[in-house]
Amino acid sequence: MQQIPLSLHLAPSYKPDAYIAGGANHTALQWLAAWPDWPLPYRALNIFGPSGCGKTHLSYVFEQRSGAHRLTQLQDISEIASLTARHFILDDFTLAERFSQEAMFHFFNHLAATGGTALLLSRQSVAQMDIGLADLRSRLRSIACQEIASPEDDLLEQVLVKMFADRQCSVPDGVIHYMVTHMERNFTTAYRLVAEIDRAALSAKKPVSLAIVKLVMMPDNGALEFDFKHGNKEI
């Protein structure tokens, strides 16, 4: 019986020195390099883009540079008084269950009063969010907003090479190119595919090859899983 390697869902590495720069994130990185000299009066920056474009990883680059505190929720005005940090990161920022509009209005006033800064990460620009509180709406529309687009080919190729290298896998350039041209263009998909391809290669006891990659990236993976379990798939 063929032993199947455990499916390990390794968390993405957000080490700041592992962040790879490219055309899609170049301007966002320039904004971070300009910190703390962000536009007054609130000195806040909104980086927005689709899921998996690298916003969270970029926030760790900012955290290392600024020592910012991660603020995961702000529901009540009374919480403002307990904020001891001056610089903040608000990841996955949405004005719903975790952040109330009234509390955020006072949060921006707090930033202006203390000379603090805030990095807000969201899928859409905060300037385009549906805000009922007019005073908060005006504040969100006054802060700098920078989009991160889906990664271009070169950036995605570099990221895939590094992900495989982190798993001690050396993968031919042609295989990387095939992946880039046949996958969804985001880092979340890249993490998932690399993990699945690594597992498939370990199961087959062979190095990562184009044949293995094609099998993993097939729309119907049921046949692949069945063959690996029964050890009768030639790769």
Describe each PLM feature range.
Residues 81-122:
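Conserved nucleotide-sensing/catalytic segment adjacent to the nucleotide-binding pocket
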Residues 183-197:
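The conserved phosphate-sensing helix
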